[in-house]
Each structure stands twice: as structure tokens, then as C-alpha cells.
Design a protein with these regions (language model features):
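Fold-independent oxyanion-binding glycine-rich loops
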Residues: 13, 19-20, 39-41, 71, ...
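ATP/NTP phosphate-donor binding region
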Residues: 1-94
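Glycine/threonine-rich beta-strand-loop-alpha-helix active-site module
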Residues: 78-185
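Carboxylate- and glycine-rich phosphate/diphosphate-binding segment that chelates Mg2+/Mn2+
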Residues: 156-264
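Glycine-rich phosphate/pyrophosphate-binding beta-alpha loops
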Residues: 148, 255-286
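Gly/Pro-rich interdomain helix-loop hinge
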Residues: 279-282, 286-320
Length: 323
């Protein structure tokens, strides 16, 4: 970070955070009356009742719903285009992403393509994308059931182009969620290995954002607190997934790390992992980051010594007047 930083801060998302706060969905002012609810192709949203709880809260708010349930762990362009076409045909006026980062990222991309012509990759600014400007998008509501991506508080969405084998992040001011509800009670069913992978994703959002050249005073505050919370509470959440205090602390750390992404940036570690999981879509994103991390951070050890020391200081002070 520069000695005399100049920066701007723009996070237009309303955040509702806390155990049991999913109930606020029935009373919040919502951006429309017909929603496409986007979930993964897995079983957990229905098995644990999360989908029905969200649909019930939306009904109480006089919102009609459709469910799109094909999203993969590494979401693909084909599904974005298919769901966007459904949005247009059914005249949905906002999109709800319910689940992990893949569902919420997909909801953001669907919201873009519901309002813009052409192909999704026309708007992506990397690889074979054409970088067309996005002029409008449907409003987005994010309801995470995992703690890792922080996508509920940033504009970024990561989608895979299967044919080109490209996995690229994209975002703009229009892809910030309008409303995000982070309820740690929706996260207690995550199995230990996924809790760990997702927690490390949040850790690397914070650590990368802290060493990035574009780090800001506000992103530093978010990053260091996220690192402290993850170091202290991720082992607890992995060992005991029903521990709501640990789940809440990791959920807050993930949200903070998402705010790091909105006020600083991930570094090339994330880009390297995106290339890995574009070729190997079964690879969990967090696991790929873990595999890269030792060699990656060793490479920058001498360039970021003071920043590394500050992160270490936050970790070694665990237990000293911190909660």
C-alpha cells in the first residue's frame, strides 16, 4: 500500500447478518415481485430445508418464484445463458442466489444476461472474452449457505467457459447484490472437508488482498480481522460443525474477506487456481488454493516482508483481549 493512499470505497449492498436472520427476507423491501431462485444441482438445499425456508419467506413478501437448480460446483456459461433465457421468458424482475459461491456467482451472471444481448463471454474482460460494457442487470439477492467466497459483499462472479477451458472472474457495479442475508444457521450442515476448503478460500481472499499493490487502509482493516477470525475459529468449525459461535465467526470472516475483494484485489494466486479448475472442474477451489499457497507466498516473501509480519502478528496475538 502506498504511504499516502488515494482510494474510493463503493459497496452498495445492504447486509443483514446473524443467526436466524433469514426471517428478515419476509419483511425486507425487495426489488421486485417475481424472482428466479438459483441453487446448485446438489441435494443439500432441499435436504436441509433451506430452499423451502427461502421460498416461504418470499411468499410472505408477496413474491412469486421459479427455481433453477442446475448449477455445478464450478459453474458454466451454458447454465448462465439457459437461466437468463428463463428469466426473460418468465418476466422475472430479480434473481436470488441461494447456496455457495457457485450459486450466487451464477445468479449475478444470470442477472446480467437477462438484460443484455449476445453471449455471456462477450462481456468478460479476460481470455477470449470481448469486454463489452454491461449497461443494465436485474437486481440480485445473495443468501450464502457456505462461508468462503464472500461473494455476498463483492461484485465478482467466476464462470467457466467449457469449450475454451477458461475460468474467469468478471464484475461491475451492477453485479453487487442489492441485499445479502448471511445467516450462520444455514451453514451448520457443511461437512468438515468443505468447511476447511471454503474457510481457506476466505483466508486467501484476505491474505492476497493484504499484500496486493492496490490495498487500501480500509481493506487492510477488513483483511487482518478476517485472518484473525479464520485462524482462531476455522479449526473449531471443522471439528464441530454445529458450533454456532464458530460458524458465525467464520461467516463474518468470509463476509469481511469479500469486502477486501471489493476494496483491494485478489492476486495472481486466484488466477492460477482458476486455470487449474478450468481444466479440472472436479477440483474444489479452496483445495486448489491450498495446493498453490506455499510456493506462491514463498515467491513474494522478500517483497512483502512487513506485510507478512503483520499477518503473523495478528495470528500470534490470538487470545490477547480478542473475542
Amino acid at each position: 500500500m502506498k504511504a499516502n493512499p488515494v482510494f474510493s470505497l463503493y459497496i452498495p449492498t445492504k447486509l443483514v447478518f446473524g443467526c436466524g436472520e433469514i426471517k428478515k427476507l419476509s419483511s425486507e423491501k425487495l426489488p421486485g415481485k417475481k424472482a428466479l431462485v438459483v441453487i446448485s444441482s446438489g441435494t443439500s438445499m432441499r435436504k436441509y430445508g433451506y430452499l423451502e425456508r427461502v421460498l416461504a419467506q418470499l411468499r410472505l413478501n408477496n413474491v412469486e418464484t421459479l427455481v433453477y437448480d442446475k448449477i455445478l460446483p464450478n459453474p458454466i456459461k451454458e447454465h448462465v445463458m439457459e437461466a437468463a433465457a428463463i428469466c426473460r421468458e418468465e418476466k422475472c424482475d430479480f434473481v436470488v442466489g441461494l447456496g455457495g459461491g457457485s450459486s450466487i456467482d451464477s445468479a449475478k451472471s444470470i442477472a446480467v444476461m437477462a438484460c443484455n444481448d449476445g453471449d455471456y463471454w462477450d462481456y468478460v474482460s479476460g481470455g477470449s472474452g470481448k469486454g463489452r460494457p454491461v449497461t443494465k442487470a436485474l437486481p440480485i439477492i445473495a443468501i450464502p449457505t457456505t462461508a468462503g467466497t464472500g461473494t455476498e459483499m463483492d461484485p465478482w462472479t467466476v464462470i467457466t467457459h467449457e469449450t475454451a477451458q477458461e475460468k474467469i472472474g468478471f464484475g461491475c457495479q451492477l453485479t453487487f447484490p442489492t441485499l445479502s442475508i448471511v445467516d450462520p444457521e444455514l451453514m451448520v450442515s457443511i461437512p468438515p472437508h468443505l468447511t476447511a476448503y471454503q474457510g481457506f478460500d476466505a483466508f486467501f481472499h484476505a491474505a492476497e488482498g493484504f499484500i496486493a499493490n492496490c490495498a487500501t487502509p480500509i481493506s487492510d482493516l477488513y483483511a487482518l480481522e478476517a485472518i484473525r477470525l479464520i485462524y482462531k475459529y476455522l479449526p473449531v468449525a471443522v471439528a464441530d460443525g454445529k458450533n454456532l459461535k464458530a460458524r458465525a465467526k467464520i461467516a463474518w470472516a468470509s463476509t469481511l474477506a469479500g469486502m477486501v475483494e471489493a476494496t483491494s484485489s485478489c492476486t495472481s494466486e486466484h488466477s492460477l487456481e482458476h486455470a487449474m479448475s478450468a481444466y479440472y472442474p472436479q477440483l474444489p477451489h479452496g483445495a486448489g488454493l491450498i495446493a498453490l499457497s506455499e510456493a506462491y507466498f514463498e515467491t513474494f516473501r522478500h517483497d512483502c516482508t512487513k506485510r507478512y509480519m503483520k499477518m503473523a502478528e495478528m495470528i500470534t496475538q490470538i487470545g490477547r483481549a480478542h473475542v
